[in-house]
Amino acid sequence: MILVKASSSFGEEDVDGINKDSSSSSSSSSYRQPSNQSLGASSRLESVHKKPLFTLGVFADAQYADKENGTYGTRNKYFRDAKERLKNCLNEFSENAHALACVINLGDLYDGYNEDSAENLYFRDASSWSEEVKARNVKEFNEMVEITEKSLTKDLKLVSVLGNHDMAVTREVFKQKMNFGEDDYYKVELPRNWVLLCLDTTDMNPRYVEENSEAWKEGHAWLASKTEEFKKRNAKPWSGGIASVQFNWLKEQVDLAEKEGKKVIVCSHNALAPGSAREGMVAWNADVISSYFESKSETVKVCVAGHDHPGGYIQRGNVHYVTIEAMLEADCGTSYGYLEVYEHECILRGVGACKSRRMRTSEWGRFTGIANFGMLTGDIDVIDSNDPEEEKLADWINDQLRTPSSASFSSDDSDDLIIRR
């Protein structure tokens, strides 16, 4: 594991923990890579003792199905385990409801089945599916909905976004059961002058939107403008994007937040920046979306997403983009996290396969990095490095972790965050 210093347009920290100005600011096509973390900055790896402004529970891609486990390359899919994993996750969130503003479901609550034509995966006619497939989708979706209703305490709001697998039942059924309003995207007011914008990245994909709708037409026009090679790499039929109507709404909400002096967190199923998930797994027009966010980085601070099961992260400009590791594929048994929001930073405390991350949201925040220890990690190792300074820092970190962290959570937790890349 390589321990690194953060790099961002806020400036890079030197060995004394003092920002040094970076004259080579990142462009939309080229971003600076992090440099090696020096031992001199180890004093910055202190515990977080202050309380957050508020905390959000987050999980992604539970993806239940009543079928045998699957594999994809070296990854495992624990379909039947998903119900128990979701139940345990929501039970813990409920136990900590006093410390949570809400819980975010980042999409793909269940796996679903379809009878789509393999010849044109950008087209879907769900009305032609067999009654058996339709009934199976409704049954398994309802089983997961029941878990959310029984496991999550009534005074803790569940906020959901639409995932591609969620479209195996109709859009209207999903929205009704998951307590959406009229729209597929919406705003949630958070404490302490923060706002959560919940987006729909199934938008713009003709497979998932109403035929001949404006989003359907826009999606077809966008696909027609791209080469087959581009579509093969970057426009997978199980993804989507943000069409014009939704994008205009998004801009209005960000402008309003900016005017009111509020900060914004964005959640969606597909990641919203190139590099924050694997190629083909981000939103189709992620380059346009992220460029806009970077122009509003005084207001937009963090974007969280699911969809790409191994997870991911990138910082573009001063905006952090986090892809949460899938609950479905967690070999250790689970994956979810607590997103703590502070005045100058956000900290994702991961449980199970979910990586912990510290993200600086102003020049006064601690440096950005990631950690993967949570409740299951042993000693920290240094991989692909013979740097004695890195070895010393890793040893120092290990000394702080001799007592395993508890999986329980409270707003008073002060577990050390181990910074690595």
Describe each PLM feature range.
Residues 267-272, 301-311:
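Histidine-centered catalytic micro-motifs
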Residues 10-21, 31-135, 420:
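N-terminal active-site segment of His-dependent metallophosphoesterases
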Residues 64-70, 205-208, 330-331, 357-359:
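Short, solvent-exposed loop/turn elements at domain surfaces
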Residues 87, 190, 291-292, 310-421:
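Binuclear metal-dependent phosphoesterase catalytic core
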Residues 39-48, 76, 114-260, 285-300, ...:
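Extended active-site neighborhood of metal-dependent phosphoesterases/phosphodiesterases
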Residues 253-275:
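Short acidic, glycine-rich surface-loop motifs adjacent to enzyme active sites
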Residues 1-8:
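N-terminal chloroplast transit peptides
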Residues 61, 107-108, 163-164, 199, ...:
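Active-site glycine-centered loops adjacent to acidic/histidine catalytic or metal-binding residues
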